[in-house]
Amino acid sequence: VITRSYGSGSPVTLVAHGLGATPGEARIPASGLPGTRVVVTLPSHGDAPDAPEGYWDYGRIAADLGTVLADQAVGVSLGAGALVRLLSVEPDRFARVALLLPAVLDQRHGSFTLQQLSDLTVGPPIYVAERRAALARLAAAAGQLPGQVAVPDASVLAAVSAPVLVIGAVGDPLHPEDVAKATAAAFPNGELWLIDSPAPMITHRTEVRHRLVSFFAG
């Protein structure tokens, strides 16, 4: 993986993007947070090399995220699932965690195609073009990730004492609200915010940014 740091000082926030995120999109969740934001670029994204064969496994991605020293973390979709896996093996790893649009917890879900991801992309034409170009590198991920779970048994997350904010969408077939609800419920200090939009990172970007700033401020 590649990491890039923005800002300076503490706290240090790890930022883990979703599948097919463009470089600019990957930075969005942490914009406005104080301290240092360390944005991870996973293989086959941005200027990172293509993923090695068999890479797309939540455990392997979690291990890569675990190499970044940080006080707190934000993950989106695939990144959220990898953070959940990391917390399952290191429950005291972070002081606070935000999980945006989790796609899976401990129950398997149906497959998805890159065409589905492309068709669900909305926004300005330049962004849509960048997103579709990013997805073109991810055929292996689309073949390997469906059927996987973030954790085999969500009950292990009861060992996580840190506050965890889960932000879910309503009407997003790839990020079901039931998964967001189950994820928030799995953490003793979990908090759920369901946004009535299938694409809250676009329709409610300002509100999400303000909520994250407030959450990490404690």
Residue ranges and their predicted role:
Residues 127-155, 171:
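Hydrophobic, aromatic-rich cap/lid helix
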Residues 160, 166-168:
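Short beta-strand/loop motif that positions the catalytic acidic residue
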Residues 190-218:
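Catalytic active-site module of serine/aspartate enzymes centered on a nucleophile-bearing elbow/loop
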Residues 81-123:
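Flexible "cap/lid" loop of the alpha/beta hydrolase fold
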Residues 39-72:
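Active-site loop/oxyanion-hole signature of alpha/beta-hydrolase fold enzymes
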Residues 2-49:
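Conserved HGGG/HGGXW glycine-rich cap/lid loop of the alpha/beta-hydrolase fold
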Residues 173-179:
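Conserved alpha/beta-hydrolase "acid-adjacent" motif
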Residues 17, 71, 75-80, 169:
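Conserved alpha/beta-hydrolase "nucleophile elbow" surrounding the catalytic nucleophile
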